[in-house]
């Protein structure tokens, strides 16, 4: 019993020490569970803002402003900063930081979950993102209208490398091709974990995203439906990927709806498996693998399916 008590006491002390390490200079506790890792290196803050090439007339969206290290610098460069913050304690810190200064009138704070909010108009987005919202936030940004000029965002290193991966790269995936369909993506710099307070467990990178304007003339839901199927097993041939019974059931359902709408008679001996294989063969993609296919390849494949009445959404 005494040993158990001693071990429990040790764990309590360890937790107390960990909590102590999360305190800011003002005694504020950071919640790493929701991605509160404050970027503390002013050189990196300035470099990120420089990469955004802000104009004095810009409205800037910042997500996860924390204690305002980057916010204050953005306010000095832009016409207005709209900061989205989930934690009311950090909202109070933000207001306190600019209170009584000329910058206060240029700051607007949106309190709540940015993924659930309607994004306002903005020219540029600059953010040290909570890493757990990286993927949904990127696509919320890229599907946002009206178009913004650019986004300069901090991500977990591996996520950033997936964003910029090319066909044939080990990290090339659905995220890579979907992002690159809608935007130009560039890896700007690596950021070590010790530049944050408290330091995260992973290394980070900064990425610049510029949406393609006008966007490609493609139904994104259709596109993503096709890409989702092919990247489930990206090392498989497309012929093998489309042999999944769940995939064939979905495509047959969509095909029958298409035929019904367009008054097309379906033969009694119709086989969706044969139809799919015929399309893959005629387009030359039967033995191709998603890992090595680029955007143009997927556009040709999607058009090949659509021309035969097969849709993915």
Curated annotation (Swiss-Prot):
Q: Which GO terms describe its molecular function?
A: 18S rRNA (adenine(1779)-N(6)/adenine(1780)-N(6))-dimethyltransferase activity; RNA binding; rRNA (adenine-N6,N6-)-dimethyltransferase activity
Record keyword Nucleus present: yes
Which stretches does the entry tag as region Disordered? 1-22
**Which InterPro entries did the record assign?**
KsgA/Erm, rRNA_Ade_Mease_Trfase_CS, rRNA_Ade_methylase_Trfase_N, rRNA_adenine_dimethylase, SAM-dependent_MTases_sf
Q: Which Pfam families match?
A: RrnaAD (PF00398)
- Report the EC code(s) recorded for this entry: 2.1.1.183
> What is the enzyme's main class?
transferase
Q: Output one GO BP term.
A: positive regulation of rRNA processing
Keywords attached to this entry: Methyltransferase, Nucleus, RNA-binding, rRNA processing, S-adenosyl-L-methionine, Transferase
- Protein's cellular compartments: Nucleus, Nucleoplasm; Nucleus, Nucleolus
| GO CC term, one of those recorded | nucleolus
Chemical reaction(s) catalysed:
adenosine(1779)/adenosine(1780) in 18S rRNA + 4 S-adenosyl-L-methionine = N(6)-dimethyladenosine(1779)/N(6)-dimethyladenosine(1780) in 18S rRNA + 4 S-adenosyl-L-homocysteine + 4 H(+)
- Mainly resides where? nucleus
What does the entry list as the binding residues for S-adenosyl-L-methionine?
Answer: 37, 39, 64, 85, 113, 128
Q: What does this protein do?
A: Specifically dimethylates two adjacent adenosines in the loop of a conserved hairpin near the 3'-end of 18S rRNA in the 40S particle. Involved in the pre-rRNA processing steps leading to small-subunit rRNA production independently of its RNA-modifying catalytic activity. Part of the small subunit (SSU) processome, first precursor of the small eukaryotic ribosomal subunit.
Q: How does it assemble?
A: Part of the small subunit (SSU) processome, composed of more than 70 proteins and the RNA chaperone small nucleolar RNA (snoRNA) U3.
What the entry lists under NCBIfam families is as follows: ksgA (TIGR00755)
| Family under the similarity heading | Belongs to the class I-like SAM-binding methyltransferase superfamily. rRNA adenine N(6)-methyltransferase family.
What is this protein's record name? Answer: Dimethyladenosine transferase
Specify the taxonomic lineage: Eukaryota, Metazoa, Chordata, Craniata, Vertebrata
Gene (name only): DIMT1
């Amino acid at each position: 019993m005494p040993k158990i008590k001693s071990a429990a006491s040790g764990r309590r002390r360890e937790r107390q020490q960990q909590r102590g390490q999360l305190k800011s200079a003002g005694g504020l506790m950071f919640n790493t569970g929701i991605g509160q890792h404050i970027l503390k290196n002013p050189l990196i803050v300035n470099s990120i803002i420089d990469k955004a090439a802000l104009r004095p007339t810009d409205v800037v969206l910042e997500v996860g402003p924390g204690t305002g290290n980057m916010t204050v610098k953005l306010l000095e460069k832009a016409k207005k900063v709209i900061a989205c913050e989930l934690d009311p304690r950090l909202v109070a810190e933000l207001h306190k930081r600019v209170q009584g200064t000329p910058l206060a009138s240029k700051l607007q704070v949106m309190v709540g979950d940015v993924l659930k909010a309607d994004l306002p108009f903005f020219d540029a987005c600059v953010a040290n993102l909570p890493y757990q919202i990286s993927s949904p936030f990127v696509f919320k940004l890229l599907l946002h209208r009206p178009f913004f000029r650019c986004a300069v965002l901090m991500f977990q290193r591996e996520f950033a490398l997936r964003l910029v991966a090319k066909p044939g790269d080990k990290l090339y995936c659905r995220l890579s091709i979907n992002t690159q369909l809608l935007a130009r993506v560039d890896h700007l710099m690596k950021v070590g974990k010790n530049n944050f307070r408290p330091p995260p467990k992973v290394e980070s990178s900064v990425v610049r995203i510029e949406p393609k304007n006008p966007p490609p003339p493609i139904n994104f839901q259709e596109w993503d439906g096709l890409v989702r199927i092919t990247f489930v097993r990206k090392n498989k041939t497309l012929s093998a990927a489309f042999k999944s019974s769940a995939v064939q059931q979905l495509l047959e359902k969509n095909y029958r709806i298409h035929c019904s709408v367009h008054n097309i008679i379906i033969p009694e001996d119709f086989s969706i498996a044969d139809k799919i294989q015929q399309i893959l063969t005629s387009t030359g993609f039967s033995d191709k693998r998603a890992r090595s296919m680029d955007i143009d390849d997927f556009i040709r494949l999607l058009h090949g399916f659509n021309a035969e009445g097969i849709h993915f959404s």
